[in-house]
């Protein structure tokens, strides 16, 4: 212990150090300097190497503009793919779409190192979003088939032809703050060669300055216009600790009304993604959804994330003149044209409110007009649905909104490539508000409602409960600011679909109003919250599962008979009353099909619940709701959907390429439930059972009364 202390070893610095290599680049001579000798042979022939061929017809001149809240997506062309994004964006994250809860479980750290410098992060989440739209007219559907034929040839297998675009690789373009673009409907990359040179100046003129400039998130996009891009956030596991109310299902970014992201439940966010394709002004595709951005082209649309205290300006234009997600009575359409079309005199002044209808129009039987609603909002106007054969009485939302900014008398149909093309005006806030005024009730709901209490918020707005003064009954009021929507036209879904379709198992909308610049939708208040609370915190027996399935299938059978596809079936979209009755809600993503438009193609829904044909970009119909219901059954059995521990894009790849998912503990499931599930989770849509067929399945005979659900609600509230 008294030994001599060892001397500390000293380490000298480097000796005879020489800085032999210092690599640089001479911009004047366009040469590298100071390269190691071994590298010279690799670069010696660079100067003599021919430059890559660039087709000038494929380059669109653009003008840099301030950041724009509204950016439109391009139609994916031949080279686009789901795979390109699936390969590159496995770490994209998703947030619960329609949760209105104020609490959220802790979020596992995704690891900052896994995200490149192009990703903007907050609380471990990354947001990507772009939107485009969906073909919904007969001509559009025919054009889509013609385009596939021209791209892939006559002898291509139909299934492969539909999914070929999902087999190539995409690449990524990073868009930074202030570099977003706005554009009206744009042509395909493959169509540019057919345009005259003057058409580029027309495209260039479509870029517009930003209304808002406080957006802070960076976006990284697939430049090959891959059909996949998301405005959602992802947490791989569910954690207890959520309170019980349900949030709107639209796939918008978080709105401005609340605190930071940590205050809300993390659930997969519904995604509305698709393509916008080029058409002349009078032949615009009615499309909605989202596509990915072409490099150096102002294509694509984005919902930008903002600072928690900032604003998320969602001019849903998730705007464009797009997605006919439902049909609008033709008289509504005619009124909108009369009110909002530009004056024939060529004046630039548009009417700022609903114009007085001439006598002939007033006598046309506008029975569903809001101006003939009864004074009591509970007396919702009854609507007699025409059969699918009489769909000529209905106009798509795209056409409806197109009428706001375009009049055939003012804008003659332009020819492709013509330098004299008339540029359509973008729908102004006043025009859109005037159009919406036609389908809502007149008056101010505050005259008969009081005691507004905010119970939650969603991506489109906030939800309050209010008390009806003369009855004391509680109602739910969804308040949505028109100026802060990502796709304003989808607000028509909130009004028209819920107004016109009434069923015991569909959430009832009493009325809707325009209060200032906000759309207020007054609907029944369901105290039981969302089914998600039950599947997350409890375990359901087969009687309870059958009870839920029976109610949902009744609602779906009714909607499908009317030609309505819900497109976002999941536990978040199922609400419960205090006595256990089950109702379907969240119609923001629904779509109408008819004989004229028998299929849809936009990538819509929440990844884990999406049907394979939706992910593969194949035309689909009401069968997609049946697949999603099957996934929801697995959710009720296992507590979460299949692949929920994987990133959404990886899960989508597995859904698209793998056999139908199975229950984790198959031995715990009865054979009758397995048979019921097998009829829904069929990869081939034509072989999938319909809602009407499933209503006759023996499994549903196990269904009990609504009261059998009540113990589950009590159980999760004790967590």
Curated annotation (Swiss-Prot):
Bias (Polar residues) ranges: 271-291
Q: Where is this region: Disordered?
A: 1-29, 97-123, 256-299, 340-373
Please give the tissue specificity annotation from the record for this chain.
Predominantly expressed in brain.
Q: Domain Protein kinase spans what residues?
A: 449-700
Xref: SUPFAM superfamilies: Protein kinase-like (PK-like)
Its localization reads: Mitochondrion; Cytoplasm; Nucleus
Region entry Linker: which residue ranges? 25-448
Which Gene Ontology terms cover its molecular function? ATP binding; protein serine kinase activity; protein serine/threonine kinase activity
**Bias type Low complexity, positions:** 358-373
E.C. code: 2.7.11.1
Q: Give start and end of each CRIB domain.
A: 11-24
Task: Spell out which residues are annotated as carrying Phosphothreonine.
Answer: 107
Give the InterPro entries listed for this entry. CRIB_dom, CRIB_dom_sf, Kinase-like_dom_sf, PAK3-like, PAK_BD, Prot_kinase_dom, Protein_kinase_ATP_BS, STKc_PAK5
- Positions bearing Phosphoserine: 104
What cellular component terms from Gene Ontology apply here? cytoplasm; cytosol; intracellular membrane-bounded organelle; mitochondrion; nuclear membrane; nucleoplasm; plasma membrane; synapse
* Outcome recorded upon mutating residue 312 to P: In a colorectal adenocarcinoma sample; somatic mutation
Catalytic activity field? L-seryl-[protein] + ATP = O-phospho-L-seryl-[protein] + ADP + H(+); L-threonyl-[protein] + ATP = O-phospho-L-threonyl-[protein] + ADP + H(+)
Function statement: Serine/threonine protein kinase that plays a role in a variety of different signaling pathways including cytoskeleton regulation, cell migration, proliferation or cell survival. Activation by various effectors including growth factor receptors or active CDC42 and RAC1 results in a conformational change and a subsequent autophosphorylation on several serine and/or threonine residues. Phosphorylates the proto-oncogene RAF1 and stimulates its kinase activity. Promotes cell survival by phosphorylating the BCL2 antagonist of cell death BAD.
Q: How does it assemble?
A: Interacts tightly with GTP-bound but not GDP-bound CDC42/p21 and RAC1. Interacts with MARK2, leading to inhibit MARK2 independently of kinase activity. Interacts with RHOD and RHOH.
- Family as reported in the entry's similarity comment: Belongs to the protein kinase superfamily. STE Ser/Thr protein kinase family. STE20 subfamily.
Q: What is this protein called?
A: Serine/threonine-protein kinase PAK 5
Q: What species is given as this protein's source?
A: Homo sapiens (Human)
Q: Which gene encodes it?
A: PAK5
């Amino acid at each position: 212990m008294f030994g001599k202390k060892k001397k500390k070893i000293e380490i000298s610095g480097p000796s005879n150090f020489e800085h032999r290599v210092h690599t640089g680049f001479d911009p004047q001579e366009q040469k590298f300097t100071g390269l190691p000798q071994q590298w010279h042979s690799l670069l010696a022939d660079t100067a003599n190497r021919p430059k890559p061929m660039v087709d000038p017809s494929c380059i669109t001149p653009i003008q840099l503009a301030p950041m724009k809240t509204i950016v439109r997506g391009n139609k994916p062309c031949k080279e686009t793919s789901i795979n390109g994004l699936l390969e590159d964006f496995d770490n994209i994250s998703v947030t619960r779409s329609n949760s209105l809860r104020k609490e959220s479980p802790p979020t596992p750290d995704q690891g900052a190192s896994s995200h490149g410098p192009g990703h903007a992060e907050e609380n471990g989440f990354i947001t990507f979003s772009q939107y485009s739209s969906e073909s919904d007219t007969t001509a559009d559907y025919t054009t889509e088939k013609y385009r596939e034929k021209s791209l892939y040839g006559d002898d291509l297998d139909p299934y492969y032809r539909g999914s070929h675009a999902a087999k190539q690789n995409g690449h990524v373009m990073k868009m930074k703050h202030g570099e977003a673009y706005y554009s009206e409907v744009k042509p395909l990359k493959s169509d540019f060669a057919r345009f005259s040179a003057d058409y580029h100046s027309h495209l260039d003129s479509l870029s517009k300055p930003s209304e808002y400039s406080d957006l802070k998130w960076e976006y990284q996009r697939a430049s090959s216009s891959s059909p996949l891009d998301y405005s959602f956030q992802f947490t791989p596991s569910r954690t207890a600790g959520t309170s019980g109310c349900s949030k709107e299902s639209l796939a918008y970014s978080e709105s401005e009304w609340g605190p930071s992201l940590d205050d809300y439940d993390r659930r997969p966010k519904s995604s509305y993604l698709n393509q916008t394709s080029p058409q002349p002004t009078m032949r615009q595709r009615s499309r909605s959804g989202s596509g990915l951005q072409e490099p150096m082209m102002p294509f694509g649309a984005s919902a930008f994330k903002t600072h928690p205290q900032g604003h998320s300006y969602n001019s849903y234009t998730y705007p464009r003149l797009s997605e006919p997600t439902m049909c609008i009575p033709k008289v509504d359409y005619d009124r909108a044209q009369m009110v909002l079309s530009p004056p024939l005199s060529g004046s630039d002044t548009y009417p700022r409110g609903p114009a007085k209808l001439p006598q002939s129009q007033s006598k046309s039987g506008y029975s569903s007009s809001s101006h003939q609603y009864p004074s009591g909002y509970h007396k919702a106007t009854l609507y007699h649905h025409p059969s699918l054969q009489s769909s000529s009485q209905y106009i798509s939302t795209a056409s409806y909104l197109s009428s706001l900014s375009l009049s055939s008398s003012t804008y003659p149909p332009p020819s492709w490539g013509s330098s004299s093309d008339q540029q359509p005006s973008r729908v102004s806030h006043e025009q859109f508000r005037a159009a919406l005024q036609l389908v809502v009730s007149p008056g101010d709901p505050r005259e008969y409602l009081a005691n507004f209490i905010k119970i939650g918020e969603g991506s489109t707005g906030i939800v309050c409960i209010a008390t009806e003064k003369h009855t004391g009954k509680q109602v739910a009021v969804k308040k949505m600011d028109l100026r802060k929507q990502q796709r304003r036209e989808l607000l028509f879904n909130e009004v028209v679909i819920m107004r016109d379709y009434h069923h015991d198992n569909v959430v009832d909308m009493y009325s809707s109003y325009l209060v200032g610049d906000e759309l207020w939708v007054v609907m029944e208040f369901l105290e039981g919250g969302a089914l998600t609370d039950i599947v997350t915190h409890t375990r359901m027996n087969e009687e309870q599962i059958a009870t839920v399935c029976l109610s949902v299938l009744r609602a779906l059978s009714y909607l499908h008979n009317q030609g309505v596809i819900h497109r976002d079936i999941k536990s978040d979209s199922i609400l419960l009353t205090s006595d256990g009755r089950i109702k379907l809600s969240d119609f923001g993503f629904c779509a109408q099909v008819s004989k004229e438009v028998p299929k849809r193609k936009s990538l819509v829904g929440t990844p884990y619940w999406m049907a394979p044909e939706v992910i593969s970009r194949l035309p689909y119909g009401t069968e997609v709701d049946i697949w999603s219901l099957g996934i929801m059954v697995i959710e009720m059995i296992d507590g979460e959907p299949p692949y929920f521990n994987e990133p959404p894009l990886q899960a989508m790849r597995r859904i698209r390429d793998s056999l139908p998912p199975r229950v984790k503990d198959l031995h715990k499931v009865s054979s009758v439930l397995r048979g019921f599930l097998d009829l829904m989770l069929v990869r081939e849509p034509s072989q999938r059972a319909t809602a009407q067929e499933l209503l006759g399945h023996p499994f549903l005979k196990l269904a009990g009364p609504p009261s059998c659900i009540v113990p589950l609600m009590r159980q999760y509230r004790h967590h």
